Amino acid sequence: GWQGGMEGGLAMAELLTGKGNPSGKLVDTFAASADDYPSTANFHESFDYVNYTEDIYVGYRYFETFARDKVKYPFGFGLSYTRFQTESMGLAVQGTEATVIEKVTNVGGMSGRETIQVYVEAPQGKLGKPLRQLAAYAKTEELKPGASEELILKAELTELASYDDSGVTGHKSCYVLEAGDYIFYVGTDVRSAREVGRVTLAELQVVQTVTEALAPVQAFKRLRPFFFGENKHAIANWEDVPLRTIDLAERILRERPTQSEYMGDQGWKLADVYDKKITLEQFLTQLSDEDLICMTRGEGMCSPKVTPGTAAAFGGVTDGLQQFGIPVACCSDGPSGIRMDCGTMAYALPNGTLLACTFDPELVEELYEMEGMELRKNKIDSLLGPGINIHRNPLNGRNFEYFSEDPYLTGTMAAAQLKGMGKYGVTGTIKHFACNNQEFKRHDANAIVSERALREIYLKGFEIAVKQGGAYSIMSTYGPVNGLWTAGSYDLLTTILRKEWGYQGIVMTDWWAKINEEGEPGSGKQTIPMVRAQNDIYMVTADAASNSNKDNTAEGLADGRLTRAQLMRNAANICCFLLRSVAMERLLGREEEECTELHSPVSTEGAGDSGQVLARLELPEPKTGEEIELPLEKLSTKKGTGAVYQLRFTKIGRYELVFRMSSTLGPLAQLPISVFLNNTLQQTVTINGTEGKIVEQTVILAIRQDGEKYMKLYFGESGIDMSRMFLRYVGKNDIESFRNE
């Protein structure tokens, strides 16, 4: 769907009344039936796997090549209250860059904007190609009736290269431009685009030689076009998909870093690296093995160490790490605005699909510059977005969060968001890397994909975001690709991402993700392959220091499956992120003055209902361990409601507020409760859906002064069934050091 954010209703009113003129374009092909999409046949073929048999023929690449008659509304189609006339001013080629100039004239009676799109038909060669591939797009300014604008669109020929995963061209594991005519089409959608010129290559050109990576290990067949005579409509043909030929275990072992040392505390802080007094490598030699292991664990959700109600804290999450001056960074859901489960207000932005329909990266960059300002105001270092998976099938339940069926449009839109947020020193975490193309069984369903389809379709948007948008935070997926859960996929996260693309940043798991050794089932405790693959941070744990998730990283270090050097490498990735983050500037007190002014007090009072006083309780002198029941008769746990208990404390000390609760929702549901004392947030706790099982959560309250206090509970989502709630007196021990005094 096209969710318009908090201003979407006003925009719709302007369009319906004629005050504004629509200029959006479809980012997906609309066919007559869901059954017309080639991926539908295997979309729910199995609970255990998904065969990507359509290969690179996704969306308009399929329909324009094989099934033009099935299309109701083509990719790039849009409506306007005015009419435009377009005129080609020619095609020019210089080096590897093709330039198209298109004149657009408003010949209607109302001001409006138009989008021009450039598509290329590559020669079929030995690999087979779609008949259309988006290569460039541009949008006019608002043109008054009779006004014209010349748009200059540039397309890099090397970006049109195809990946040879079989060696059929004689150049296996290479991106190649096969010999023949590259025909350029220009128009206002893929179907109406007309030929404006050709570029002819006399012989095959190797654009880039890479390494075989992430090839499938299970045999299946993939679609390729067969053309008969002069017929421009392809017939579906099928070929065997090339399988992995390299020894992955040998590659991982051969490339394993081994050099590291432990020098103990030398008195250096991360600020010394920031000030270029020492190198990062020198700094990391001070960290013990336990420190390095703790850095691989993010904490959440709703960690009290960062902005209340956010998704996770990472970096300096333990006392030991903070002693070395390592800051704690904060990340928050996204992508359509900041999510703070304590009820703090934030702007709701249009979703990814709607933003992509603008075909206007400059506008998107401007919007996300403002989002960057809001992130900085709330002391959030990364928004968990944009989501940039491909619209492989219209039945994917999360398509609204992603941009398009086209990887080029996807990548350029993601790059625009990252550039916008970057102007305020914050960033987005692009997700889900890669092939999160369905929600059903996404924790376990194995995506079986050819290496060519991965590189040309499903990884391409991420590659553009890294190379053009400067991405430096990425989230892997829940599920496996070609047998390996992505959170521990070495070829995905090291061979392709870091070695080929030159990525310098962090990778985090999705929340409570699984990882596996090849051939074994996935588990959230199996973090050894995660560390090896340079998935730097496991999201999330309740407490990094105590290994609350019971991961096996320390076990792997002890028995040689991991090295200290691998842990140091991942810690370096995390520290590099922190060194360029606002969290580091805040820790050092070095934020620019105009940025510190952003940190005006942000309300942490729960949104929605201010809360009905459910009970007034006098708490007599409690004994240590004594439990004081809180009545539940009038308690509502509906989303957005607040419940207030008026409590008179007669004894100072530490109290435990204990919730015993359940939810009939499934384990993907996230259900937060925020606890306030006299309108000051104490803590937000989050449970997942328990499928009816009762669980317990505890919030510590430090009562430093006797007398009356108002305790408010704010429920961020519906679905909690509270079975019991009580206060337990703990005593006065350590109250001076308790952080929530």
Predicted regions and their residues:
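Short beta-strand elements
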Residues: S192-T211
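Glycoside hydrolase catalytic-domain context in secreted enzymes
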Residues: G1-S192, V210-G642, Q646-E656, P672-E696, ...
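Catalytic-site microenvironment of enzymes
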Residues: F659
